[in-house]
Amino acid sequence: MFRAQQNAFDDAVAKATDENLTSENWEYILDVCDKVAAEESGAKDAVAAMIKRLAHRNANVQLYTLELANALAQNCGPKIHRELASRSFTDALLRLANDRMFANNPDFGIMEQAYMKLKTQNPNLQPPSKPGKREITEADRQKEEEELQMALALSIREKPSAAPEPKAEPSTSVSEPASQTQTATSQAVPPGTSAATVSRVRALFDFQPSEPGELQFRKGDIIAVLESVYKDWWKGSLRGQTGIFPLNYVEKLPDPTVEELQREAQMEAEVFGQIKNVEKLLTLLSTRSSELNVQDNEEITSLYHSTLSIRPKLIELIGKYSQKKDEFTQLNEKFIKARRDYESLLEASMAHPAQPQYGRPGQAPYGYPGPAAPLGYPQGPPQSDPQRYFSPRPQDQTHMYPPTSHSPDPRGRTPPAGPSFPQHQQPPPDSYQPVHHRPESTYDNPQELGTSVYDSPVEHPSSSQRLPYPPSGAQVPPGVHQQFQHQQQEYPPSGYPPEDASKPPAAGFALQPPQQTLQQPPYPTAPGAHQPTPSHQPPPVPSTASKPTPYPSLTPGTPSGGEYQAYNPSQAGAANSNPNSYYR
């Protein structure tokens, strides 16, 4: 009987916000704006028509209605502003959007109140600001460690208590903590929570990294927590990527309880139990003729309804196992990369084995201590007169092997003629002495300082005397020993004066290399005069009188007036016919 008056703007607003439009039709929108501006009650009627369109279930209709309201607010002046700021229109916008152009106008306070109401009731509409990156203090790390130890102790305490419980009532002690955990962790991660007690978090908002090292994620992603990095930032892993993320963008996920695991297992069993019904339904549908009425067949209908109930569970399981598949794929890729790195390092180490530092392992190079150097060295007899023997300073003994004495064999043994080559002989372990000891000759008794360039030999205590080892690197030209043996039959030993100590002993003798000279401390004939030690046999004991020299001098470079004269012993020494008295 009482029929509501039809709104004149319903058709125009419906035409401008038609759901079949692919985009905004500004021709229809401007027609509505012109009509509102032309009529006195046009603003009120247009807003009422838009409120109806906002209640439409089609999202395109809602978007076109909001665009129409925006166009009216910009083109129709204060009248339409008052209508748009009314409580009826703002209530319709509470779950859609808000118009920011009313924020600073106190006349339209209802719209501002609606905006604040949206912010307070729905805080998750906009993501929060990122917290600052503050370093974790030592107290925070200690607290995190304490929480971890406490959680481990609680888990160990709960396992023995849960074992003797009967299966009939397993949820009495587990359901209450699980419900409390779920209610406590439904919100964002609390400030006091540490990464040691949280294994997974769920993203509440989309996060776009602004700095390198931050983890990108979308709302709903499950992030695996690794460790705490900053005060309000944790490190996590998602889809093979590792980075840090803010805590106010995520919420803590509790570990699944026993009831949840049993529920998931039961759901999976139900889904897999319906596989045979699905296969049977497919078989019936494929074997029946097309003329068969499916609605009249009760078997097909019952099978269809029974299998239709597992569809949401099946979709959930597909998502669950798809995520597990991605996780296992990423784990496999990491394992393959780690195995390849290990194999490459192993091949590199096998291709380049460790080389010994000095020479062969069985023989140490000359001038370096061998592995058995400090063992088994003989010590010299006690010294009766330290002034009569040469004792080098400790700083001069920088080599492990002592200088080899080049005193000849008193029995007159001469090496065979021929070219001699430098060679390394392995001396017996007891023929050398350690560093910083007085050098000794190859004989057992100490040796006096000689009065000529040749060392004075000492008498052998026994016939089993060891022969000296030639030094490493010393070269003796062929024919030198024969030449000198021929000369020593005619000449007595001669010495160099102190002023000519720097001259070479003879042109026919091979000089020692610098290293060999340094490793053989000379025996000076006078203070301050250092003469190299020759490597040949000394001449025999001189006779009582000096004979003329029919042969040229050993130093042909010196003039005839400065030739070296033969040593003339004193008359007292000549009267002594015992040759051994000369060496005392």
Curated annotation (Swiss-Prot):
* Membrane topology qualifier: Peripheral membrane protein
Compositionally biased, Polar residues: which spans? 172-188, 442-454, 567-584
Mark out the compositionally biased spans (Low complexity).
161-171, 354-378, 475-489, 510-534
Could you tell me where this protein is found in the cell? Endosome membrane
- Which residues belong to any copy of the VHS domain? 16-151
Which Gene Ontology MF annotations are present? phosphatidylinositol binding; ubiquitin binding
Which residue intervals define the domain UIM in the entry? 143-162
The record's listing under SMART domains reads: SH3, VHS
Pfam families, sorted: GAT, SH3_1, VHS
Region spans: Disordered? 121-145, 158-193, 354-584
| Keywords on record | Endosome, Membrane, Protein transport, SH3 domain, Transport
Q: Which GO terms describe its biological process?
A: protein transport to vacuole involved in ubiquitin-dependent protein catabolic process via the multivesicular body sorting pathway
Principal localization reads membrane
A GO cellular component annotation here is: ESCRT-0 complex
Query: Where does the SH3 domain lie?
Result: 196-255
Annotated Basic and acidic residues bias? 132-144
> Which Gene3D superfamilies does this UniProt record tie to the protein?
1.20.5.1940, 1.25.40.90, SH3 Domains (2.30.30.40)
- Indicate yes or no for the key word Nucleus: no
For whether the record's keyword set contains Transport, the answer is: yes
Q: How does it assemble?
A: Component of the ESCRT-0 complex composed of HSE1 and VPS27.
Q: Its function? A: Component of the ESCRT-0 complex which is the sorting receptor for ubiquitinated cargo proteins at the multivesicular body (MVB).
Family note: Belongs to the STAM family.
> What name does the UniProt record give this protein?
Class E vacuolar protein-sorting machinery protein hse1
Q: Which organism is it from?
A: Aspergillus fumigatus (strain ATCC MYA-4609 / CBS 101355 / FGSC A1100 / Af293)
Q: What is the lineage of its organism?
A: Eukaryota, Fungi, Dikarya, Ascomycota, Pezizomycotina
